[in-house]
Structure formats: structure tokens, C-alpha cells
Amino acid sequence: MLGQIRATARATAWPVRVIRRDIVPRCGPMGGVYTALKTTRKEAVLFLACDAPFVSIQLLDRLVQKFQAARGAWFIAHQGRVGFPFLLPTRSLTVVARQLERGEFSLQSLAVEVKGKRFSLPRSMRLQLQNVNTPEEWERACRMWRRRRVTEPAHSARQRKPSAS
């Protein structure tokens, strides 16, 4: 599953990093967010979940386009909540550090604290937000993956100047 997510990320032609060990452990996704922001040299970081194999290049492009139009934190909202993928400017590091100090590990709180902008996906793209966490979900994901129509092959990286990593 991580291989598929990595292939999609690499197909964007943007720099890709996989965070394997958090600087601040046992903080859920916030540990990885802190680690990525602390260690990047880029203006912003686009965060993907390791358990969401259906995210497409088109969805990632939407996030980056939103960021390019209005520099700031961008979150996808679904059913009133935010989650992966999302994009944070590197300047969000101080807010993330404060949240960790307070023991707040929620992405919902992060979106509020960074004054993140939210947008919803059209119905046709919502399947991409599906997480795979159990053997049953894995089996269902495999069936869906076999039926999935590929609109852009993962190996067809487009050439452009990266603005987020």
C-alpha cells in the first residue's frame, strides 16, 4: 500500500520523503507533521497518509493549486472534518510545536490553530479519502483497486517546477 502511495507522490515530479521515525514519538500523525516541517527546506509540505491508497495526482494537484492561489494551510473537509491529505506552509512549525507541548494531537485542532482553509471534494473524488486499516478494508480496497479506472498512469510524471514537498 505504501508503495502505491509513494508511486502516486513521485508521479507528481515533486520531491518525496517518507517519514519513518518521528522526532517526537507517540503523538500520532502530529509527530510526523512536526518532523516533516522541522526537517524540510521547502516553503510547504504536502502530507499524505500511509493508509489511503486511492489518492490521485489530480487531488494532489488541487491542493497545490489552492496553495499557489492563496498561500496558507489547506485541508480537505469531508463530513465536517479534516484529514489527509493536507498542505502546510513551513511557517506552521511553531503552531505544531505549541500543540505538541499542550498534548493536542488532533488534526482538527491543527486546522483551527493554523487558520487552515478548507475545501470539499466533488462526490466523484471522495472515494480517494478512504482509509485502509483492517484486513476487511484491505480486501475491499483490493477489489476496488482492480475495478478502478486509471485516468493518469502513475509512471507518467509531468515536468514542472515543484512548489511543495
In which residue ranges do the predicted regions lie?
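Nucleotide and nucleotide-moiety/phosphate-recognizing core
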Residues: 1-104, 109-128, 135-149
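Intrinsic disorder/low-complexity detector
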Residues: 133-135, 157
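Hydrophobic helical membrane-anchoring modules
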Residues: 143-165
